[in-house]
Amino acid sequence: MDQKARRRELVAEYRRTGPEAGVYRLVNTKSGRSFVGSALNLGSVRSKLEFARKTGGVSALDHKLWADARQHGAESFDLEILEVLEVRPEMTQEEIRADLATLEALWRERYDPSQVY
């Protein structure tokens, strides 16, 4: 298979499935605190963390993490995918966002509030 055909295949697969939506946690390995969030595209969260690690900048991260990221560095944060939302083709963006908000709230309840940003 040539490169162009492979690229077309990958693009078609992406369009069929769309990005992976879900709930994640960024854990500060130095302080033990964590940030629980949700995203329509978990890949973008991974990319933002990688960018912050490579550049040493903190602006790619959530503003609640900036102080600790400046103090300990972005490399002190680990990404954990807590749950991937099964997105059905008939779901609207609003339904996906509502489901993500519910899942995020359920996951937040599992952690000690004093250890969550």
Q: Which sequence ranges carry the predicted segments?
A:
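Structure-specific nucleic-acid interaction/processing domains
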Residues: 2-36, 40-117
